[in-house]
Amino acid sequence: IPNTSNRVDFILTGEDENHHQNYVLVELKQWEKAEVTDIPQLVRTFVGGGYHNVDHPSRQAESYDLMMKSMNEGIYGNNIGGYPCAYLHNYEQKHPEPLLDDRYKDLVRQAPVYFQNDYGKLEETFRKYVGHGKGMAILYEIANGKIRPSKKLVECIDSLYQGNDDFILIDEQNVAYQTILKKSEDLDHKSTIIVKGGPGTGKS
């Protein structure tokens, strides 16, 4: 992901049946279960040796996709379409399934979640968007695309200075942001929240 230490897990490139250039961005998760939280866009699962609130996989995939579309000239300069999704290959879907809870429906609509037994659906997604060849040429454009903000991103930053909320937060940034918002809504008294992080991690 441009200007971050984050990496996309998996990308397939190719054309669809209408000869549009596309890529499918896949966020891979080894999770086996997850729980809903009362904090928007976040779920609770076992990572890093304990249970933590983290971005919903769909939200993570979509944020990575938005960053690439905003910063990679090979993508926005060639009108390459991006289709994010998440594949939880160790996760057997529950009924009801926490990750498909109504509170996450907008996220899942933007970036579908595929579970352990959904490999057929994932294959259909690949065939639909990138199953008609020319993948190497498209991958070359992405891999060699210059990292510079698109006009759309520049307009977005200008919009921020006008007081609008348009920023793309990824991973821990979004977890911190959503947690702070929830805390501020729940508290009925003045409070101080300290955000800890190294240089360039997005604290501001």
Question: What are these regions, as identified by a protein language model?
Answer:
Residues 1-143:
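Accessory nucleic-acid engagement/destabilization modules that flank
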Residues 140-158:
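Conserved ASCE P-loop NTPase core motifs with emphasis on AAA+ ATPases
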Residues 154-164, 189-190:
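Short glycine/proline-rich turn/loop motifs
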Residues 195:
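Hydrophobic anchor at the beta1->P-loop junction of P-loop NTPases
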Residues 199:
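The conserved Walker
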